[in-house]
Amino acid sequence: GDYFDFHRLSPKEICFSMGDVAGKGISAALLMATVQSSFRSRIQNHTGHLCVSEVVTELNKQLYANTAPEKFSTFFLGIFDEETSTLRYTNAGHLPPILIRNGEASLLAVDGQYGESSILLEPKDLLLLYTDGISEPQNDYDEMYGEDRLIELVKKNAHLSDEGIINAVMEAVKQWTGSDELQDDMTLLIARRS
């Protein structure tokens, strides 16, 4: 199951996250609920500076101690500071977000395992987080839609509204698979710097 969340941490900071729990059905839903409650508890009880790498490291320890080895979740966590326009983030196995800046695309990399990275977001930057239900659907020839196609599609449609981009992505994936039925959960989160 897919997961996303966002919270206002302070008058100047917004926290957002996305994850993807392995598997389907009840067991995946329960693990997703565990991830959500653990994450929310951690950020709601924080005081002062919240270190994204520490949050994800603690979340990983808790999940590792309380779940079967074959169960896991990816997780991306970002905190945007509206005063400085800085995004602090870490990534625990999730697909790297796509940053569109001045018509060019790049992937947000991280420093080491759950390392905290940061980037200054510029006006008109577009950040796209997504789950593998977007990039991994297959066509009749067993070819995945893929990250490269997604990047090109988002670059081409970055001028559209957020809803317009989401609709373009969903339609492209449907056309790729030749079906209106989803092969997996599909989650997109778009953030723009004004």
Feature roles, as predicted:
Residues G1-A22, I26-M32, Q36-S194:
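Conserved subregion of the PPM/PP2C metallophosphatase catalytic domain
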